[in-house]
Amino acid sequence: MHALPRYAVFGNPAAHSKSPQIHQQFALQEGVDIEYGRICADIGGFAQAVSTFFETGGCGANVTVPFKQEAFHLADEHSDRALAAGAVNTLVWLEDGRIRGDNTDGIGLANDITQVKNIAIEGKTILLLGAGGAVRGVIPVLKEHRPARIVIANRTRAKAEELARLFGIEAVPMADVNGGFDIIINGTSGGLSGQLPAVSPKIFRDCRLAYDMVYREAAKPFLDFARQSGAKKTADGLGMLVGQAAASYALWRGFKPDIRPVIEHMKAL
């Protein structure tokens, strides 16, 4: 039996995850000791790994790529956010032995933009680049903030149109995107290999915030491009990472961490 409350992040790979450091900072704020580990589940072995974790005393888990859709199907019940996103990044062990799935990615993004970067989403025009799981996961919460308009652009138009129909937003081909957006969010994974979304530099001429959902070096190509093209402010996804983790922590423990000092702590590492 484990003496400390036990949590973990599941992914493949998982060794790079910053979640253990982030959650230990939250535990310091709460004044408690927790155990938080990384679990690299085999492809095809995720459900068994999660089952074993909870059966041996696990209290809650984060889920990262490539298991967010599988986590959705594994959960016994879902939050409205998870249902809308069709993906789960947080698993909560309930007292009756069932597992509840939630998605805190959108909360992390929206809180970083509105509370840390101090830019309101309400009434603004938003451009989302990419149409994968990362983008789908944040649209429901962005819509809750009542922007004037959300447009999604993707390399393959069909995927963008599918999300546009699902969420009642607009879709355009990347090559056809022009300016007129207050907030531009990059949800493509191109930065991981140094690639930029195939968009014109003109899209940044009215941009108040260019945001990349990945962080550190992976965000650099897009943010440099945005800055050089006229974006007034740029930000990587570290605040989103800390914010979604804080929302997960609150679901597990009923304690709401202050994300600002943790963002600064993670920047210094």
From Swiss-Prot:
Protein's name according to its UniProt entry: Shikimate dehydrogenase (NADP(+))
Reactions catalysed, as given in the entry: shikimate + NADP(+) = 3-dehydroshikimate + NADPH + H(+)
Species lineage: Bacteria, Pseudomonadati, Pseudomonadota, Betaproteobacteria, Neisseriales
Quaternary context: Homodimer.
ATP-binding listed as a keyword: no
GO cellular component: cytosol
Associated pathway: Metabolic intermediate biosynthesis; chorismate biosynthesis; chorismate from D-erythrose 4-phosphate and phosphoenolpyruvate: step 4/7
Residues at the catalytic site: K68 (proton acceptor)
Gene Ontology BP terms: amino acid biosynthetic process; aromatic amino acid family biosynthetic process; chorismate biosynthetic process; shikimate metabolic process
GO molecular function annotation: NADP binding; shikimate 3-dehydrogenase (NADP+) activity
UniProt effect for mutating A85V: In strain: FA19
Keyword terms: Amino-acid biosynthesis, Aromatic amino acid biosynthesis, NADP, Oxidoreductase
UniProt cross-references to CDD domains, sorted A to Z: NAD_bind_Shikimate_DH
Summary of the function given for this chain in its UniProt record: Involved in the biosynthesis of the chorismate, which leads to the biosynthesis of aromatic amino acids. Catalyzes the reversible NADPH linked reduction of 3-dehydroshikimate (DHSA) to yield shikimate (SA).
HAMAP family in alphabetical order: Shikimate_DH_AroE
Family: Belongs to the shikimate dehydrogenase family.
Keyword Amino-acid biosynthesis carried by entry: yes
EC number from the UniProt entry: 1.1.1.25
Binding site for NADP(+): D80, G130, A131, G132, G133, A134, N154, R155, T156, R157, A158, K159, M213, G237
Matching Pfam families: SDH_C, Shikimate_DH, Shikimate_dh_N
Amino-acid positions noted as binding shikimate in the UniProt annotation, renumbered to this chain: S17, K18, S19, T64, N89, D105, Y215
